[in-house]
Structure formats: C-alpha cells, structure tokens
Amino acid sequence: MSGRAKVAGEEALVGVAAPQPVPAGILDECTNVTVSQPPSPPRPEESDCAGCLETPGEAAALPCGHSLCRGCAQRAADAAGPCCPRCRARGAGWARRRARDDWQADAEVLGERARRGPPERCRPRRDGGAAAAGPRPEQESRAAPAEPEFIFRAPIKLSKPGEFREEYESLRKLREEKLQEEKTSEDQIHKLLPEDTEIGKRKMDEQKKRDEPVVLKTNLEHCPARLSDSENEEPSRGKMIQTHRSAFVSKSSSYSLAFLAGNLNSKMERSQSCSDTGQDRAKSRLRAAPTSKAKATAMTPTSNPIIGVLLSTRNHRCLSAPDLTVEKRLPFSSLSALASLHKPERSISPESNDSISEELNHFKPIVCSPCTPPKRLPDGRVLSPLIIKSTPRNLNRSLQKQTSYEASPRILKKWEQIFQERQIKKTLSKATLTSLAPETGDDLLVSEVTQSNKEKPLLALNTRLSSGQVLSECTGPTAPDLDYFSSVSQTKAEQGSDRKKNTEIPLETCCSSELPVGASGTSLEREQSERSGSSPDAKLDKTRITASMKISAVNSVLPKNSVLGGVLKTKKQLKTVNHFDLPNGVLADNLGDEPLPSLRRGRKRRCKTKHLEQNGSLKKLRQSSGEVGLAPTDPVLREMEQKLQQEEEDRQLALQLQRMFDNERRTVSRRKGSVDQYLLRSSSMAGAK
C-alpha cells in the first residue's frame, strides 16, 4: 500500500470510540500467549487488517497475532500457501479451520479489541466519520511500542548426573549374575551326567546278570539239538559248569596224562569233519581204543613227549609250531628234563611235514545255526529250526598220513629218541640261544648223545639213520654225505689233541659215522667201543682203525669217476682235494671246526665272504691235523702220507707259478703309441686313429 492510503485510513479512524477491554482468558485462548502482566492495549498494526491495512468490521485473528478482515482471510484460505501477509508465518490448518467457520467469534474478539483501542483512532469510524472531516493534528502522539514480554520456560532435564553410569553398572551386574547361574547349572549337569550313565550301566549289567540264566534255560528248552563246530563247540547242559578247554593247547600248560587219556576219545569224535561218513567215524573209534590203551601202559616220564606225536588226530590243532621259550632257559646238561617236557612236534607225523597242513584247518566245515527265534506250533510245541551245514572236501585226509595207529614198543622208543634229538638240536642251535655257547656246547651235545647211546645203542644208531645224517647204501654218496665224512674226520682230528679230557667222544662219533658201511662193520665197531679200556693209547689205536675202515668203506661205495678222483686211505688225504674244483656245497661248508653238519644250519658264518671262509677253514684243517703229530706205524700209510705231502707241495708250487704267469700276462705296456695302450678302446676309434 502506498503512504497516501495509510494516511487516509488513519484519518478515517479518528473519532472512533475506544473499545472495551477484552477479558484475559479469551485473549490467552485466541493468541496462545501466556501473559503474566495485565494486558496492554493493542497496537494499531495489530488491530488493523494485515491484508488491506483497514480496521475490519469482521476480522479473523491469525496465530502470529495479526488479524485479517473477512475478504483477506478468504483470499488467504484459497491461496496455495496460506500465510500471514505481514510476517509471512504459515497457518494452513488455521486458514482451513477459519474458512469453515462463520467468523463470528473472531469478529467479536476483534470488535472488542477495536473498542479498547485508542479512542482518537476508533472514534471517527465509530461515529460514522463525523470527525473525519475535521482538521487532523500535525503531530499525532503515538503510543510507544510495548517491551517484549519475557516468557520463562524451565529447562528439560534428560537425566541426573551419573544416572547413565549407574544404569550401565546395574545392567552389567545382572548379565554377570545370569552367566554365573548358567555356568553353575552346566557344571552341575556335567557332574550328574557321568553318575547317571554309570548308574544306568550298573543297572543294565545287573539286569543282564539276572536275565542270563533265564535266557540260557529258555534256549536249552527250546533248542536242545543245537550243533556247533568242533573248534568253537559250546558245552552241553551237563558240562556247563566245567571249563571248556580249547583245541589249541599251549605247550606250557601242565595238564596231566590222565586228562589226555580220559578226553582222547571225545576229542577225536568231536574233531571229525562233517564230510566223514559213519563208517569212517566207526573206524576212528576202533583205532582210538587201542591207542589209548598203549598210551596208558607207556605212561612214563620218558614216553611223555611221544604221546603228543602219536596220539594226535587228523583234524586236531593242538600240535602247532613249537615254542622254545622254556627250552632257552633250561641248562644244557638237563637232558632228562628236556625229555620229560611235553613239547609237541611241529608236524603230527614223524616225517617232515610242510606248513600247509595247519592252514588246511581253515577249510573245515562250518556249522551255521539260524539266529531267528524258534517258532511255536498251534499246539504249543516248539518247531526246531533247520541246521544248515556246509560240506567241503576234506583236504586233510588226502595230504596227511593217519598217525593214530598201534606201533610196536621198539618203534615207539625209536621215535621217542628222534623226538629228543630234535629237541636238543633246536635248543642248542645258535639261532635260538640267548647266551653265548661256543664250542663247549658242541662237546656237550656229543657227550650227552654218547651217554644216551650207551644206554640204548641200537636206538641211537637207528636215530642216526632216520635223521638223515649218514650215507645211503642204495643211492651212493652225494654232496651232503661227503660233507659229513669230512666233518667227522676233522672232528676226530680236533678231539685227538684233547683226548685226555674227552676220551669217549671220538669212538662214539666214529661209531655213529660207521653206520652206512654195513651191519657187520657197525656191530664190530660198537663192540669195540663198548669193550674198550680206559687207556688213551688203546682208544687212539682204535680211532685209527676206525678211520681206516671208514675210508675203505667210502672207497668201496664211491664210483670210479668220483669227484674225489682217488682212493682215500687216510684222514689227511682230504687236503689233497682242490676245493676250487669241487661242486658247490661239497667241501665249502664242512671244512670249519663244526663237529656235526646238522648244527651248521643255525650258525653264523665266521667270515663275511665264502672264499675267505674256505681259505680260513683249510688253514685250520692243516693246523689241526698237524697238531695231532702222530706218525702212522704202517709203512704203506707212511709212504702214502709222504706222497700226499709231496703232491701238496707240488700243487702249491704250481699254483704260485700260475699266479706269477697270470700277473705277467696281465701287465700292459703303457709306452706312448703302443697298440694296447688302452684295452677298453673300441674298434671304431682304433680304426680312426
């Protein structure tokens, strides 16, 4: 608006009556302003219309304190953004509300405000403009603007000092207490769980123990005809209390011979395979009866081991590989203790048997019993289940000889002697010894064999025959036989130097070596050994006689084109044989200082290579034969010995000359430009040169 319109409006208001004062409650409700002091008269700009600057007859109050006449208020409500035309304060909700109303209340309020206003301005309009035409004073006193009212608002307090920290501490304490309670409960649970588990196991075990007799009784009542295998057989109802002895009987178990005699028939009947017919089982029972009688009559400490050899059944497994842990701790001189021990042989027959005989037991028929519970018939009877049996071939019958048969007392003693000798060999072999036993062990072996042979000479000789240590008259000498003769001669040569200590050893050794010659020579030499006196000279003479008889017997047995290639008459003639010309195994292993070739198998080689061992053994043989130093009394033998010595010297000289000749031939000329400068040069390179 222009200033002229303002002046006109002010002039028109002169002479209007002063409005009456408005109650304070109504003013507060309309303006939303807290008034702590008595209300002051409104300013002229507040009472005028904010839009047209005229005092409205019907006015509407805005939230900002300004008022609008009816027309300006309608325009402000219709506008897109209704706001106060003077202070630009937005009041959209107010404008819409006032547009709906009839503006009556606002008009009354504004009328009262106008009546309270300055009389000089309101009087002319109230009077109808009578004084408006009068002259206006030049300077109109205006009321000074009122001071802004002070409104005290209390500050909003979010929290007290330290209240947040206290709240945080309390929350943390609650969390810690909760964790502690959870941990305590978990520990208690962990403590109770093992106890509950142990109590449950204990209850289960007690329940099983209480149920076992009932189950066994029920099984025996419902399944009386249960069958089982011979190896895994369960005891029947009558034998339930007795402990069941397995078929694998350990060697160290000290069961008595009476137990063997009483249970032999039952074991044989149980060990019959399912493929055996009734006739075979009847035959085995017939064979078992006389065998048990023979065993009962021969129940002596010396015949104890042979029971394990002769009274074993075909399908029985009690005769497994021997365990020598007990024999290792026995002294060497306890031959009777070795004989009295019950040590089963590895094979169940006196002949050697391979290892497949024990593995064939895995192919025995297996009895398969059904595991389903038995069915009951409608009348209450129990239906016994079918028993399924597998019937493979009985391989044991074809591969093993039957050994449960009667034998004469002489054969029994002979086999007992074989058994004892095998025990001694296995005990004294260096592969099974835990302590050092040098050559004294060999002498002890020969002395003990001599002592046992004096009591039973015939059995000892038969033992030598059966153990494979002598020559065969039918087939003639072989390489192991020659090995045996050389070892015997060397044994006598070594033992001749110690004839005062062991005077009976050479004679008995010679007796055992004279067996292959013939029955007459054997009996003659045995009589000489038994009737010999105690003088060392007589024993040495008989030793020489034995050597001559042995060599003559060997000459008669050897063929003309023999490897030895000559007539052996003395024990020194063995040195004339060139060991490089002999086949392997003839004199390579027997020229050492072993007394018996059967004990050579378990010994360690003294040298790391065979040629060193052979050379060393030849030297030892010459030294041992030279230590004897006994000149033969027979001139023929003396001449033969000189001849052999000359041949040996000639042979040594020839060997030395041959070595020198070979060394000269191997010497290569290394002169520059020689053809044979490099022996390994190829022909192509030589041609290129």
Curated annotation (Swiss-Prot):
Q: Carries keyword Phosphoprotein?
A: yes
Motif segment (UMI motif): 186-194
Q: Where is the composition biased (Basic and acidic residues)?
A: 110-128, 178-224
Q: What is its EC number?
A: 2.3.2.27
Q: Positions of the region Disordered?
A: 95-148, 178-238, 268-299, 489-542
Which Pfam families did the record assign?
zf-C3HC4_3
Q: Where are the zinc fingers (RING-type)?
A: 49-88
Provide ranges: composition bias, Polar residues.
268-277
Give the GO biological process terms: DNA damage response; double-strand break repair; negative regulation of double-strand break repair; protein ubiquitination
InterPro entries from the UniProt entry: RNF168/RNF169_E3_ubiq-ligase, Znf_RING, Znf_RING/FYVE/PHD, Znf_RING_CS
Cross-referenced SMART domains: RING (SM00184)
Motif MIU motif, which positions? 646-663
Does this UniProt record's set of keywords contain Manganese? Answer: no
Enumerate the UniProt keywords alphabetically.
Chromosome, DNA damage, DNA repair, Isopeptide bond, Metal-binding, Nucleus, Phosphoprotein, Transferase, Ubl conjugation, Ubl conjugation pathway, Zinc, Zinc-finger
List, alphabetically, the Gene3D superfamilies matched: Zinc/RING finger domain, C3HC4 (zinc finger)
PTM Phosphoserine: at which residues? Answer: S228, S230, S320, S384, S390, S466, S625, S674
* Subunit note: Interacts with DYRK1B.
**Protein family:** Belongs to the RNF169 family.
Protein known as: E3 ubiquitin-protein ligase RNF169
Q: Which organism is it from?
A: Bos taurus
Gene this protein is translated from: RNF169
